[in-house]
Amino acid sequence: IGNWWSGSENDVLPAGAAADGYRSATFHASGAETPLHKDIKKYVYDKGKGAGDVDRIYEVLYIRGLLNHIFAMEAVRNAQEHFGVKVPSGEQTRWGLENMHMTAADWERVGLPGFAEIKVTCEDHEGGHPVLFQRWDASAKSWTVISDWIPVMRDVVRPMMEADAAKYAAENNITPRD
């Protein structure tokens, strides 16, 4: 079983049939024909402006790229709304990132229905995001989600992370910021 960064097509295709049944964690499904994918096909690929094979827009790493762009876009949108500005500063955009809350309605609005809610704060840059598990089908060359959303174990993991961060800061003479 791999974690989320070892669960893309690039990780399994080179292994061919030997990768069949491989499982990995993920924070999003792949391969779905979402409204956003339909728009990308219509407004980009159908107009001859796409780079690469259109079928790759369904792959794990492409979707992660989409998510990064969505988070940046939503940070700017949050900052615009909160500060009442058209072009937010870097500090205002940081506020937008640190106060992001993507609800089911927000995911629907951006064309990715079914994605898990994410709420980011200064104290929690992870967003409290649950995880899915997926299995690779080598013959179909596709991932299948094989679990429901599994919540993070914050009560177990967070104290260990904070203790390790404090130890590292002390060893390296770093003053932690609030």
Q: Which residue ranges define each predicted feature?
A:
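Short coil/turn linker and secondary-structure boundary residues
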Residues: 7, 85-88, 160, 174
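Segments of small-molecule ligand-sensing domains
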Residues: 51-62, 73-146
